[in-house]
Amino acid sequence: MPADVLVIGGGVAGGAVAAHLARAGRHVVVIERKSGPHDKVCGEFVSGEAAQYLRDLDIDLEGLGAVRITTVRIYARHQMVTASLRFPAFSLSRRALDEALLRTASKYGAQLRRGHSARSLRPLGGQWVAELDHGRNFLAGGSFLATGKHDVRGWRRPPGKQNDFIGFKLHWRVVAAQAAALSSYVELFVFPGGYAGLSLVENGIANLCLVIRRHSFERLDNSWEALLTTLRADFLALHQRLSGAEPCSDRPLAIASIPYGYVQSRNIGPWCIGDQAAVIPSFSGDGIAIALHSARLGAEYYLAGKANSEFQARLARDVTGQVRVATLLSRVLVKRWGQDAIMGAARVAPRLISDIADLTRIPNDRL
């Protein structure tokens, strides 16, 4: 028997929309390409609005080991500014968060099909059929595309507004003194051509996530080791955080051609959520919130029998402003003059950083 809904992708958006739909009694099948818990190339900042969406799904962030974040430190060359966040926030690994959402979806009755990728997704006689990599097909009345930064054949996103970034992510087991120094902080290191974020997640692990423009990475011979060495030489604080630390894997996770600034505003067929609907620059820390917002909104519109086109248009209205602001700031942040201007302004008006953080959040009246 066909499912009511196919969800392609079991990340934040996919797990959340599956939970919402299954809780409402729909027969949901989730296709997730990884067979078990895994890390993903992204920051792991859970903003206040994201935390509320998770509480609505009965997910206990602190029970999962999430670390409270109250303050941001920004470093550029030999400068540093500090700002308090005006909203409650947490840091939690995607490994833990994604699994919690999939467990919740499963608890409500969603069926999980793990370890297989969707090779294609296509309409068929008023329904949707997903062909998996082992040849099996799944049929459903509706489909949600939630594959994050990875596209499904036939549904490739157009470019964003800033497409030349390469992303890296590596977890580190830091020494106790540096974990204490980092506790309750998220640190942002801006450098010509990119920026890096560092924060604690659960179990005393620090997440180092960064993006760098392709041509800047090429100047370093496309070498992760050279990039990390350069950053540690340029930022004493980062060098201190990683002193004595052990990387949790041999190599960082990596991804290229991130379509920052992309927003889907029309019905292309499947319901697009998460990064398939909007890609906000990583420094904003609001990607998880957008994923959860799109999942809840998509589920509400689907359950109410509203058209996909209405949903995509509403979601675009909700997030376009913040994505546009964040993309503009991202373009400024990767340039030396932009870094100097922002750091200088922040020293004169310390609330500037808090104001920027507010501008890159989903507006309260849209939640």
Predicted regions and their residues:
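Beta1/beta-strand and adjacent pyrophosphate-binding region of the FAD-binding site
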Residues: 1-11
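Glycine-rich FAD pyrophosphate-binding loop
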Residues: 8, 22-42
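N-terminal Rossmann-fold NAD(P) dinucleotide-binding loop
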Residues: 14-15
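A conserved beta-strand/loop capping segment in the N-terminal third of enzymes
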Residues: 50-102
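Predominantly flavin-linked oxidoreductase catalytic cores and closely associated redox partners
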Residues: 104-238
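FAD/FMN-dependent oxidoreductases across multiple families
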Residues: 137, 216-301
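C-terminal helical "tail/cap" subdomain of flavin- and related membrane-associated enzymes
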Residues: 300-367
